[in-house]
Regions:
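Conserved Rossmann-like nucleotide-binding pocket used by diverse enzymes
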Residues: 3, 8, 28, 54-56
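A short beta-strand-turn-helix
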Residues: 4-23, 64
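Conserved helix-turn-beta segment immediately C-terminal to the redox Cys motif
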Residues: 20-22, 39-58
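Conserved redox-active cysteine motifs that mediate thiol-disulfide chemistry
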Residues: 27-41
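Structural microenvironment flanking redox-active thiols in thiol-disulfide oxidoreductases
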Residues: 60-67
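Non-catalytic, surface beta->alpha helical segment in thiol-disulfide oxidoreductase systems
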Residues: 74, 80-112
Length: 113
């Protein structure tokens, strides 16, 4: 089982940018209705991906620096990182099947050196 971990401005670099495992970061806020709709989709997707991707949540209200650094203007925003680089950005809600297909393609793409 792959759970979704909370990130902060302090842990973002070590957990996401320095990881060898691709990561999905959900930029969200507690007051955001669509963010609450994304949460169960991410949880189910994380379980299906079975450790091939790391899944994180970053509360934009509490971690403004990282949100500003990545130009987060709307939430929910899902940023996908591979080899320390942002490789995809999904803004708003995406159905689970669509999200899984998109992430599966990322996992199957060979690592670039």
């Amino acid at each position: 089982m792959n759970k979704i971990e909370e990130l902060t401005d302090d842990t973002f670099k070590s957990e996401v940018l320095e990881s060898n495992i691709p990561a999905v970061v959900d930029f969200w806020a507690p007051w955001c209705g669509p963010c609450r709709m994304v949460a169960p989709v991410l949880e189910a997707t994380a379980q299906k991906m079975n450790g091939r991707l790391k899944f994180y949540k970053l509360n934009t209200d509490e971690n403004l620096n990282t949100a500003q650094e990545y130009g987060i203007m709307a939430i929910p925003s899902l940023l996908v990182f591979k080899n320390g680089q942002e490789v995809d950005r999904i803004i708003g809600f995406m159905p689970q099947e669509q999200l899984e297909e998109k992430l599966q393609n990322l996992v199957e793409t060979p690592q670039e050196n």
